[in-house]
Amino acid sequence: MHQQHSKSENKPQQQRKKFEGPKREAILDLAKYKDSKIRVKLMGGKLVIGVLKGYDQLMNLVLDDTVEYMSNPDDENNTELISKNARKLGLTVIRGTILVSLSSAEGSDVLYMQK
């Protein structure tokens, strides 16, 4: 009777090392805006305003007390908000891939603008 050995039994098990590239710094320092109200314009003409609770280097955001507004489709600059279509979202995660711009809700400081 012949015993069959698989190749994995003959070789000692090797630990696979997970590739870890250099840690990237955030595109912008949002730490000073943590627990502050920010205004986030999203692709598709939506705007959300909420309190920044967290973020990562990919610009994914966690906002609390978030309110979503639809902008007027005829307004090219998206400055006119349709407040009757405001929705309270509460705690929200926003993916960095859909951000158009990010600014302070109190002032007019633009923190981030998509190129």
UniProtKB/Swiss-Prot annotation:
Residue segments, region Disordered: 1-23
InterPro entries assigned to the protein according to its UniProt record, in alphabetical order: Lsm7, Lsm7/SmG-like, LSM_dom_sf, Sm, Sm_dom_euk/arc
Biased composition (Basic and acidic residues): 1-10
Residue span(s) of domain Sm: 25-108
Transport in keyword set: no
GO molecular function: RNA binding
Keywords recorded for this protein, A-Z: Cytoplasm, mRNA processing, mRNA splicing, Nucleus, Ribonucleoprotein, RNA-binding, rRNA processing, Spliceosome, tRNA processing
PROSITE patterns reported for this sequence: SM
Compartments it resides in: Nucleus; Nucleus, Nucleolus; Cytoplasm
SUPFAM superfamilies in the record: Sm-like ribonucleoproteins (SSF50182)
Outcome when changing R95A: Slightly reduces affinity for poly-U RNA ends
One record GO biological process: maturation of SSU-rRNA
GO annotations of cellular component type: catalytic step 2 spliceosome; cytoplasm; Lsm1-7-Pat1 complex; nucleolus; nucleus; P-body; sno(s)RNA-containing ribonucleoprotein complex; spliceosomal complex
Stated family: Belongs to the snRNP Sm proteins family.
Summary of subunit composition and partner proteins: Component of the heptameric LSM1-LSM7 complex that forms a seven-membered ring structure with a donut shape. The LSm subunits are arranged in the order LSM1, LSM2, LSM3, LSM6, LSM5, LSM7 and LSM4. Except for LSM1, where a C-terminal helix crosses the ring structure to form additional interactions with LSM3 and LSM6, each subunit interacts only with its two neighboring subunits. The LSM1-LSM7 complex interacts with PAT1; within the complex PAT1 has direct interactions with LSM2 and LSM3. The LSM1-LSM7 complex interacts with XRN1.
Function: Component of LSm protein complexes, which are involved in RNA processing and may function in a chaperone-like manner. Component of the cytoplasmic LSM1-LSM7 complex which is involved in mRNA degradation by activating the decapping step. Together with PAT1, the LSM1-LSM7 complex binds to osmotic stress-activated mRNAs to attenuate the osmotic stress response, probably by limiting ribosome access to the mRNA and consequently translation. Component of the nuclear LSM2-LSM8 complex, which is involved in spliceosome assembly.
Additional notes on this entry: Present with 3070 molecules/cell in log phase SD medium.
PANTHER family reported in the protein's UniProt record: SMALL NUCLEAR RIBONUCLEOPROTEIN, U6 SNRNA-ASSOCIATED SM-LIKE PROTEIN LSM7
Protein name per Swiss-Prot or TrEMBL: LSM complex subunit LSM7
Organism name: Saccharomyces cerevisiae (strain ATCC 204508 / S288c)
